[in-house]
UniProtKB/Swiss-Prot annotation:
Residues 197-214, 312-327, 466-497, 622-634 have a biased composition (Polar residues). It comes from the Eukaryota. GO terms for molecular function: DNA-binding transcription factor activity, RNA polymerase II-specific; RNA polymerase II cis-regulatory region sequence-specific DNA binding; zinc ion binding. GO terms for biological process: cell adhesion; cell wall organization; G1/S transition of mitotic cell cycle; negative regulation of transcription by RNA polymerase II; positive regulation of antisense RNA transcription; positive regulation of septum digestion after cytokinesis; positive regulation of transcription by RNA polymerase II. Its main location: nucleus. This is Cell wall transcription factor ACE2. It holds the Pfam family zf-C2H2. The lineage of its organism: Eukaryota, Fungi, Dikarya, Ascomycota, Saccharomycotina. PROSITE patterns: ZINC_FINGER_C2H2_1, ZINC_FINGER_C2H2_2. One of its GO terms (cellular component) is nucleus. Residues 197-216, 312-333, 465-509, 599-635 are annotated as: Disordered. Keywords: Cell adhesion, Cell wall biogenesis/degradation, Coiled coil, Metal-binding, Nucleus, Repeat, Transcription, Transcription regulation, Virulence, Zinc, Zinc-finger. Disruption phenotype: Leads to systemic infections characterized by fungal escape from the vasculature, tissue penetration, proliferation in vivo, and considerable overstimulation of the pro-inflammatory arm of the innate immune response.
Length: 703
């Protein structure tokens, strides 16, 4: 582009004072309009075209505005053009082949190369890009400014909200501070009042501090607690009226934080003339009885309630006036008010103390007893039938008072329990009975124990144990009644009865190790190499006891050392010791077969021996039961003498073979049994069914 301007600069210019004609003005006007319409400079287009024409080796003619130049100048211009054409090299692409073949030139290619135009286009594009970039930057700046303004507005709103929250917090803090100051003032006032009250209590006299509270109603009750023994003592010592002045032994009471809230009421007194309380107390004993107004008069006319002896009055006042010299029957405790229904129980706190109040009460009881005897109305204390309360000093059944009047002191509990007998026992001597053999017979000799897994049920079935089976180290022959009472008491106090566990000499739960309960309610033995199944737990436990050689049932017969797993096995064994079969030589046997063997061994002086080969062998199923046969023989009073002499002989005849018996009879060695009316021998049982009826055989022999 600069090259073109330099080239055009060599063209001779028109003088400045040259005057343009109207035609020239019109031409200039048209040129200006074209420049304005096409929006580019005419000189630039001219230079562009001139450059392209030079590349195409096309000679250039002067422009119309240069027509007024003189000839010399024109010639010079032509020469300059030629010289410039010959001397100045091409600035485009070293005059390479251009795409001018479209114009019909020879040896020209079809590739169009317009370097200057592309450069100009690049310049225009760069300018446009700069304009677009500037516009984009302006737009981005506007958007950014809008965002910043919006954020500033949001921050301003948030700041205002935070200021409002801060103001609310400050207001709450001020209110809390005021409340705390008010609470501190109230606490300070309360502390001041408390300190004043404490100072007043400290400066009070001991008698005022220990003065009892007065109850509002007659049915109010003092419940004492925090005593040395941990029990409750009720009622307080009675008030004694001396010259119309009520004197009450002091009773300690708990200090309340606010003394104004303490209730005042009179202590309960059994000896004061109060008919309503007397009726209420009598109804506690028996609802049907009436302990009413007539007895109130008896109490009011007591000599002790209005004594005339001045010495007694002075001694009583001296006793209650000084708290140091007085012996209070109450232990140190705190008392509170309660209206809970109570149960009274005496307590022997005054047995070993000869205090003046107890002596005075004894005198009072004696006077009341005399007056009641005179009036024919003897009253008994209703509390003698009350049960023992846990927590009292002595848990023994109370007995009637000698004077027949109220006891001196009582204990208070909410829940009564059964009384316990005052009988010395050795650490559950009735709880774990020692049993052996039959559990209900002779249970001490062999030392077999019932092992209970649950101690809460150890007293069940205790009534089944006979008196001879219990052993006590301190029990004498005169305590049989106490033992029976103790057994009865254990029965009533025991937990619900449960079936006794199976006796065993093994530790608890040892047998269960070998028991496996199956889903089908069967049981499998887990003992090595066993694997048997049972349908009942009792059976499998007995089976396992045979594996473990656990035989708790021992025979108590003298000289017998056998033991069994089951009780019925022991019972069957004991029958072997019952010898109902006696030999003429004096020996006794438990079975007939044993007796016959004895006779056949030449050890007996009885009848002749029968050969063993001739003995009739019977099936064990058909042998008679020795118990049934012996009972049939021994229970017949008509044939007692006859059977005593002839039973053994008759049995021998029945045991013989018929042919053997006939041979002996023919030889005169065996005398047949005669038929008599006295011979009403009972028919043999099933054991002799194979021989038939003995009378039929005898009848055959006689024939």
């Amino acid at each position: 582009m600069n090259t073109f301007q330099a080239d055009w600069g060599e063209i001779p210019q028109m003088p400045k004072d040259q005057v343009f004609t109207p035609q020239d003005q019109l031409t200039n006007y048209n040129d200006n309009m074209m420049d304005n319409l096409l929006d580019f400079n005419y000189n630039d287009v001219d230079a562009l075209l001139s450059e392209e024409l030079k590349d195409l080796d096309i000679p250039l003619a002067p422009s119309p505005r240069d027509l007024n130049m003189n000839a010399e100048q024109s010639l010079n211009w032509m020469q300059d053009i030629q010289g410039h054409r010959s001397n100045k090299p091409s600035m485009s692409h070293k005059r390479g082949m251009s795409g001018t073949a479209i114009f019909g030139f020879k040896n020209h290619n079809k590739t169009l190369s317009i370097a200057s135009f592309s450069k100009n286009t690049d310049i225009i594009n760069e300018a446009e890009n700069e304009n677009v970039k500037g516009n984009t930057d302006n737009q981005n700046g506007f958007v950014l400014s809008q965002v910043l303004l919006k954020q500033q507005e949001e921050l301003r709103l948030a700041l205002e909200k935070q200021k409002e929250v801060n103001r609310n917090l400050e207001r709450q803090l001020r209110e809390n501070r005021l409340q705390q100051e008010h609470i501190q003032r109230v606490l300070h006032d309360q502390e001041a009042v408390t300190s004043q009250l404490t100072a007043q209590n400290v400066t009070e006299s001991p008698s005022k501090q220990r003065s009892p509270t007065k109850y509002q109603g007659d049915d109010a009750i003092i419940v004492t607690k925090n005593s040395s023994s941990g029990g409750y003592v009720f009622p307080p010592p009675p008030r004694v009226t001396l010259n119309n002045e009520a004197v009450t032994p002091p009773l300690s009471f708990s200090r309340f934080s606010n003394i104004d809230q303490m209730e005042s009421s009179d202590p309960l007194n059994y000896l004061q003339p109060n008919a309503d309380f007397t009726e209420a107390y009598a109804s506690h004993k028996t609802p049907e009885s009436s302990f009413g107004k007539e007895h109130a008069s008896v109490l009011s006319t007591s000599e002790f309630l209005r004594p005339t002896n001045a010495a007694r009055e002075s001694s009583s006042k001296a006793m209650y006036s000084s708290p140091n010299s007085m012996i209070s029957p109450h232990r140190k405790k705190d008392s509170v008010l309660s209206t809970v229904s109570t149960i009274l129980q005496p307590q022997d706190d005054y047995q070993n103390t000869a205090s003046p109040p107890s002596q005075m009460l004894n005198l009072e009881e004696a006077n009341l007893e005399n007056e009641q005897k005179n009036n024919g109305k003897m009253l008994r204390a209703p509390v003698e039938i009350m049960p023992t309360i846990p927590g009292s000093k002595n848990n023994t059944p109370m007995t009637a008072n000698k004077s027949g009047f109220m006891p001196q002191k009582h204990t208070f509990q909410h829940t009564p329990v059964k009384a316990k007998n005052n009988v010395d026992m050795n650490e559950r001597s009735l709880v774990r009975p020692e049993l052996s053999g039959t559990p209900l017979n002779k249970s001490v000799q062999n030392g077999m124990h019932f092992r209970e897994e649950d101690d809460s049920n150890i007293l069940h079935h205790i009534s089944e144990i006979p008196q001879g089976s219990t052993s006590h180290n301190n029990t004498t022959a005169g305590d049989d009644s106490n033992v029976s009472n103790r057994l009865q008491f254990s029965n009533t106090e025991s937990s619900p009865s449960r079936q006794r566990k199976k006796p065993t000499t093994l530790p608890p739960g040892y047998i269960d190790r070998y028991v496996k309960e199956l889903p089908d309610k069967n049981f499998e033995c887990l003992f090595p190499n066993c694997g048997k199944f049972f349908r009942r737990r009792y059976n499998i436990k007995s089976h396992i006891q045979t594996h473990l050689e656990d035989k708790p049932y021992k025979c108590d017969f003298e000289g017998c050392t056998k033991a069994f797993v089951r009780n019925h096995d022991l019972a069957r064994h004991k029958k072997t010791h019952d010898k109902h079969f006696s030999c003429p030589c004096g020996k006794k046997f438990s079975s007939e077969q044993s007796m016959m063997k004895h006779k056949n061994r030449h050890n007996c002086t009885g009848p002749a021996r029968v050969p063993d080969s001739k003995m009739v062998s019977k099936s064990p199923r058909k042998q008679s039961s020795p118990t049934k046969l012996s009972s049939a023989i021994m229970n017949s009073p008509i044939k007692e003498n006859y059977l005593k002499e002839n039973t053994n002989l008759h049995i021998d005849q029945l045991r013989m073979d018929p042919k053997m018996r006939n041979a002996l009879e023919d030889g005169g060695l065996l005398k047949p049994v005669e038929r008599t009316e006295a011979m009403a021998f009972p028919s043999p049982l099933s054991g002799y069914s194979d021989l038939g009826s003995p009378f039929r055989d005898l009848g055959t022999i006689e024939e």
